[in-house]
């Protein structure tokens, strides 16, 4: 019987390519020992990471960053990110330090921001000196143009591109030490940096080319030829009854990789060829002509792209049979099988490959203790020791560039986690410049002359979203849940987290930092404790995460849970420790879901009023603090505490005072 409580007064392919293999994560080999991969950067210890981090971003000198200075500087860092200011290297602090971020300091550094500089003109020029092979040039050009438009939309600044000479903002990609005295650090970690307005390097923006640059949702593949020339691959796509999440040579005898540019190739028949050096090259002096294999360079014959003769690690080829004679060359485009990092300079995966005597047909994490998936770039890793990481979602060049161009305009890092100018990278699908960003840039340059000057009550484009403050505002939370032992409060794209009720939660933090791919606003959330998976509801879909990884195949429609089609939104959900069943509330009804059988229990839905006496319809959240013996029902600014065994209501109280430490 459900609880009755008193609420009180209240308101078929031939081979599977790298990206698909990474997702499937299947390997033939047995577990292997952990090894040292050549060219891999060993992870730093927590202490090493902290000293370097605080030196780079908070000015703690390496030579004198001893225990006492370290503790004091740590408190500054923790304050900046809204963490408890303990001065200790606790788990939350280390997690924050390990997140990918901008290379500019959080405490103003003279070389980056001397005396709050700004441009003394509104017409700013930019020049793109180099390109990443991860994206075609048109996509890179568009990402940079859109990133600059983010700032011109809200200021009088206007940006124009030049192709020769010295521009105000010189844009380039580089690896490690790249000529400005501020080296990058390989894959992940530091993503980019930019200099404040000024002469020389002032305004220049540099991007780490050891990263995988995308638009934030995996590799961006623009096709050539076929019947969809210039369009983008649609992943996954359907061909012969099977979904493909990467380019494939299935159905072809020439070995060329292709993809569909719509989901259903069988229906639409739209396709193109994926980037490959046999189709075209980039840059160089050969006007895009394809590689010519074999080609001769310095007396040696090459049958594939090479990095020989270069110090920047970029793969190139001759476009005639004799480079020594003709001097014609181009850079090899990245394919949908290209690796990232490692020691193969972006060479593609080769399957199957041999590793420690075992054969692997797909990307694997064997040999590693960090869970990262990799592949060999020759048939035998044991002999050749050539490898690279398999592609992931990558980093949005548009978002990172928009952040860096904010620095190039004179903005420093923001402590507002919802701001574009916050130092940690977080992918946001439907990006909007925040109120904090707009206020900062307009303090330097003023508003755009094109802005709507209407003083009416309606929203204007320059206001931007404001990061909420839980103790200063009356916030109605979208969801509340205990996940991995922590209590999370959700509101729009922000979360606050705490271990114990009444303690003021840490935050706000961005939801996307913990659970990428979620929409900006959820309706409900709960943890399935049996599997330690977090389940989120938004609209007529739901998402399932293991830690921060979205389970394959999600989001799924609510109907796949057993909810009827007329349920288009869920109000609240929780797993009740009393019977290990999950309860899902929508409007005036609720359902009971069996996590073991993966289906709804018979006899539901039931009316909330018939089973949960005096609990109102349209709840905001329900939480069972596992092990605590109580469940909590939230609506508006108040909550009810229910004793699980006796089913008695034992407390009615304020969320602000009892849960938020206000």
Swiss-Prot record:
Hemopexin repeats mapped onto the chain: 474-518, 519-565, 567-615, 616-662
One Pfam family recorded for the sequence: Peptidase_M10
Highest taxon, organism lineage: Eukaryota
Region span, Required for inhibitor TIMP2 binding: 414-662
The record's account of how the chain is modified after translation: Phosphorylation on multiple sites modulates enzymatic activity. Phosphorylated by PKC in vitro.
Signal peptide feature range: 1-29
Protein name: 72 kDa type IV collagenase
Residue ranges annotated as motif Cysteine switch: 100-107
Region (Collagenase-like 2): 397-467
Function: Ubiquitinous metalloproteinase that is involved in diverse functions such as remodeling of the vasculature, angiogenesis, tissue repair, tumor invasion, inflammation, and atherosclerotic plaque rupture. As well as degrading extracellular matrix proteins, can also act on several nonmatrix proteins such as big endothelial 1 and beta-type CGRP promoting vasoconstriction. Also cleaves KISS at a Gly-|-Leu bond. Appears to have a role in myocardial cell death pathways. Contributes to myocardial oxidative stress by regulating the activity of GSK3beta. Cleaves GSK3beta in vitro. PEX, the C-terminal non-catalytic fragment of MMP2, possesses anti-angiogenic and anti-tumor properties and inhibits cell migration and cell adhesion to FGF2 and vitronectin. Ligand for integrin alpha-v/beta-3 on the surface of blood vessels.
Annotated region (Collagenase-like 1), positions in chain: 110-221
Similarity annotation: Belongs to the peptidase M10A family.
Catalytic activity, EC: 3.4.24.24
Region annotated Disordered, chain positions: 446-465
Gene Ontology molecular-function annotations: fibronectin binding; metalloendopeptidase activity; zinc ion binding
Binding residues for Ca(2+) 1: 134, 209, 211
Zinc recorded as keyword: yes
Proregion span(s): 30-109
Gene3D superfamilies, per database record: Collagenase (Catalytic Domain), Fibronectin, type II, collagen-binding, Hemopexin-like domain
Residue sites binding Ca(2+) 3 per the record: 185-186, 208, 211
Sequence segments annotated as region (Collagen-binding): 222-396
Native organism: Mus musculus
Residues reported to bind Ca(2+) 2: 168, 200, 202, 204
BP GO annotations: angiogenesis; blood vessel maturation; bone trabecula formation; cellular response to amino acid stimulus; cellular response to estradiol stimulus; cellular response to fluid shear stress; cellular response to interleukin-1; cellular response to reactive oxygen species
A GO-annotated cellular component: sarcomere
Catalytic reaction annotation: Cleavage of gelatin type I and collagen types IV, V, VII, X. Cleaves the collagen-like sequence Pro-Gln-Gly-|-Ile-Ala-Gly-Gln
